[in-house]
Amino acid sequence: MSYKVLVADDDEGQRKSHGFALEVVTAILEDEIEIIETATSVETWAKIKSEQFDLIILDNDFKDNNLKGHLPGIALLQLAKKEGPNKSTPTFFCSADAYDTLKSMVEKYSGIYLPKVGYDIEKVAQLFADKIKKK
């Protein structure tokens, strides 16, 4: 079986960290993972509304304010859970912001809040694997 994962973050270093964690997931699940990367909110929304994913890893703060259709990550999460093929897709919401309000909003839309600070690749990989297996 093969899994399809969307990694949406404007920071290339953060996308690489998620990629490393997903390599560990591949070993845990003993299955292949196709990783689709996006760097803007506009590109991310286009993927979320048109393609089915087994897991979504979503940033909050995209630096594409200059693009028409720009959305913050929390708005992308809300839209994904309301329309399109990813309503029930497990979604990890990554943010350097440790606001309780943001965390509450993420949980309201069935997302899993994942702080960028203290990112432990092995623990994160296990979280990703657990969510993919349950889907």
Model-derived features: where do they sit?
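Conserved phosphotransfer microenvironments
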Residues: 57-81
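Conserved phosphotransfer cores of two-component systems
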Residues: 49-51, 79-88
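Helix N-cap/capping motif at the beta->alpha junctions
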Residues: 31, 37-43, 70-73
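C-terminal output helix
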Residues: 101, 117-129
